Amino acid sequence: MPASTSIPETPSKLPDALLVNSDPASKVDNVSVKIEQESPLALEGSPLPTVSDVLPETNNAHEEVSSSSWSLSSSDSIMSYDSLSDDVSVLSFLDCPLTTFETAPSIASFSNSAADVSSHSRSSSSWSAKLSRFTKHASKPSLSSNSSDSSFSKSGSESNALSSRGSFELEPHGIHRHVSRAKRLLSKFYSKFHHKKEDSSFDPLAPLVFAPNTSRVLRVTNEANASAISLEKATSLSSQEQPGSEIKKELSLYDHEFDQILDLAIKAKKDGNLENAIEFLEYIMPEVASQQNFVPYELAELYKQRGTSQDLKSILPLYMLAASLGHDRSSFLVGEAFFYGTYGARENKLRALQYYHLANDKGNADAMLALCKLYLRGLPGHIFPSSRRAFEYAHRAAMLGHAPACYVLGKFYETGVGCVKDLAKSEAGFRAGLINDSPITDADALQIASTLVLLQ
């Protein structure tokens, strides 16, 4: 019998140098740290970081690959762009998914347990230091091993303090204490527009932080019934009195009917009666500004049309008041005022960048286009140039149907800066931007287009 050849057995255990760890958990200083695959910390191009998170980008090739979860997904679906039909919306040819704006993820979804955090060394917790940038109230691990009880009691008191604070104080991008700023601005205008017939015991700042008083709601309802009965009589008598008496009569009858006075202001603005519209809005502004944040914005726009020296001084405070109450257009205009130093504001690029981000979070397309311009060129001392992030801001604004942003997005695809060059999508963007054959007059859009031509 021939001697059997021995077949070498496959080793049951590979050498340590050839082992590949497929588990998403990695070892850092003998401590297992769970890394979420969908966590923003695992994505180098996470969308909309804070100003301090923007880092220099040294590899353009890597910048093309890294993208946020809402960025362009042209590799997923391939469409034919040979012919562009007018029957289909040109925005559909951009192959950009319509998604909601992403918010900052919850800290609890990618935070470690208390035992893991306490066992980390300072050299191995760089990811937790980066994580703390998402919120200024992030809990810090204690360096002392004997202070666990005190740290737990401190975190409990901090959570109670957070629950009692207003929602405006937790706004991102460094703009905090919006309620206190709104109360301070509103108190100035209330002292200016205070009326003798107004109840002196009523606090106009209460609606900013408290629910409407039940007794006051009942009193307003009773006065509404009385004013509705005498409305027809007041209208007939106003034509026989002096020209300025009509407004005073209506204000006395509609003493607390703010919605109806607001309707009168809107009607006066449409009719071109600027003085009446301003007087109506000045009267109701301290009362309704907290519930209807467009009232300070509309009053500032009327002041801008009238154009007196006193009016021009009041425009920026009114814009800041409306921005503090969540008005997106006012946030963008305050950013413009700080960026260019207009309306009496001192030029402050960082403050302008913060207000641009605040307006962007509210969904303002003009602010997105302004951020696109800043990230494309860079802002010395604050942000580094990033063509990819500039493309994402233009993409988001174009998905809102903003015509200048559609034109800018077409220019991105034409030049191939920050994205893959695609002439078909470029043509679709240009057609979406030229609505009703109107030329692009937006200053930011024209500056971005000229910059893209230089960068290609």
From Swiss-Prot:
Report the domain of life of the source organism: Eukaryota
Q: Which UniProt keywords apply?
A: Phosphoprotein, Repeat
Q: Name one GO molecular function term.
A: enzyme activator activity
Q: Which residues carry this modification: Phosphoserine?
A: S227, S230
Q: Which SMART domains match?
A: SEL1 (SM00671)
Q: Can you cite a GO biological process for this protein?
A: fungal-type cell wall organization
Q: Where are the Sel1-like repeats?
A: 293-327, 328-364, 365-402, 403-438
**Compositionally biased, Low complexity: which spans?**
140-158
Sequence segments annotated as region (Disordered): 1-20, 38-74, 139-158
Task performed by this protein: Involved in chitin biosynthesis.
Could you tell me what this protein is called?
Answer: Chitin synthase regulatory factor 1
Q: Which organism is it from?
A: Schizosaccharomyces pombe (strain 972 / ATCC 24843)
